Amino acid sequence: MYMKKFNKVILAYSGGLDTSIIIPWLKENYGCEVIAVVGNVGQSDELVGLKEKAIKTGASKIYIEDLTKEFVEDYIFPTIQAGAKYEGKYLLGTSFARPIIAKRLVEIAKLEGADAICHGCTGKGNDQVRFELAIKTFNPEMQIIAPWRTWEIKSREEEIQYAIDNEVPINITYETNYSKDKNLWHLSHEGLDLEFPENEPKYDKILELCNTLEKAPNEAEYITLGFEKGIATSLNGEKLDGVTLLQELNKIGGKHGIGVIDMVENRLVGMKSRGVYETPGGSILYKAHKDLEELCLDKETSHYKEIVSLKFADLVYNGQWFTPLREALSAFISKTQETVTGEIKLKLYKGNIINAGMTSPYSLYSEEYATFGEDGIYNQKDAEGFINLFSLPSIVQAKMAQKLN
C-alpha cells in the first residue's frame, strides 16, 4: 500500500483495460473508496454494461454523464471553424475530448468531496497532459493519481494478466490488444503491428466505423450540406442538430470509406507515435467548410487564418483548451465565420470527397471579373501598371546586382 492515504477518489472511467484494473489497484494500494465517472462523448455501444462492470470491479458508485451535445457544440464545431488539423492530418478527435471530461471530473470531485482524481493515461502519452492541465485549471489544489507513472505494470500484456489474476472482466486478448479511443467524432487505433512503420495496417481487421475501399460502394453518392456562420446546420435540406447531423455523416462517410488516415505524429512528450484514425463524418465537414470558406473569405483573412489554424491545432493537441490564447484565437475565428454561410454539394466515392458545386449569399466570386470570355468590367490594360509597381522591388534588386557584377 502507498504511503499517502485517500478516502475518496474520482476515477476517469471508460470500462477499457486500463481503467478496469485501476479500480482494484486503487483500493489495494490506497485503501480508498472509488467513484467511477464516465464522460459520454458519443461512445455509443461502449457504454453498454459499464455500470454493472464498474460496481462488480469494486467502484462504490458510477456517474455516466451525457456530454455529447456540449462536446459537439462547444468543442467540435469551433475546431471545424478554425480549420485546425494537427500536423496537417489529424482531426484532433482524442485531443478535444479530454478537456470536457476533465472539467466534469473536477465538478463531481467537488460534489462528492473527493481527495483526488485518477486517470488511466500512460506516462508516454499526450492524454496525461491534457487531463492534468484541465484539472489544474479548475482546481489547482486537487491531488492527481496517475497509476501508469507509479505502478509496476509496464505493458498491456501485464495489464491483461493483472486483470485475469484479479478476476476483472475484459473482452480483449493478447492478439486483439489494439489501444483504442472512440467518441462521436472518431475512432483511433494504436499498438501491436502498427508500432512498426514498415507494416501496412490490416484495415480489414482494424476498421470499425469505415468500410475498406474495396468494400465501399461502386456508385457515388451525392449529399448537400448547409452552413450558417461556419456551422453545419442541415443535411440534404433537412435541419438537424449537431449531434444528429454528425451521426448521419458518420454513417454515410463510413459506408464510402471516407476519413481513414495512417499517421506518424509528433507527440507532446517528445516521441513519435503511429496511429490509424477513422473520422468519416468529421472529414466530410472539414472538406465542406474549407471549400465554402474559399468562396466567402477575402484573400488576406483567408491567408492569415491559415496561420491561426496551425496554432489553434497545437493548442488543442497539447491540452491547452482552457487558456487565454485559445479563447483569443476563437474570438478571431468567430469573426471570420460571419459570412461563411451557404450550401455545398459533395460527391462521395471510395474514400474521396469531391466538391460538386456550392452557393452563398456572401460569395466573393464574381463571374463578371473572373471570366475568360469577353467582358466590359475588367480592363486588362490596367494590369500593366499594376505589374510595374508590383515588380519594382525585384527591378531595384536586379539593378543593384548588375552594378556589383
UniProtKB/Swiss-Prot annotation:
Binding residue positions for L-citrulline: Y90, S95, N126, R130, S179, S188, E265, Y277
GO cellular component: cytoplasm
GO annotation terms (biological process): argininosuccinate metabolic process; L-arginine biosynthetic process; urea cycle
SUPFAM superfamilies: Adenine nucleotide alpha hydrolases-like, Argininosuccinate synthetase, C-terminal domain
An annotated Gene Ontology molecular function: argininosuccinate synthase activity
Primary site of residence: cytoplasm
Subcellular compartments: Cytoplasm
Reactions catalysed, as given in the entry: L-citrulline + L-aspartate + ATP = 2-(N(omega)-L-arginino)succinate + AMP + diphosphate + H(+)
Residues that hold L-aspartate according to the record: T122, N126, D127
Residues engaged in binding ATP: A12, Y13, S14, G15, G16, L17, D18, T19, S20, G120
The protein's name in its UniProt record: Argininosuccinate synthase
Organism: Clostridium perfringens (strain 13 / Type A)
Name of the gene this protein is made from: argG
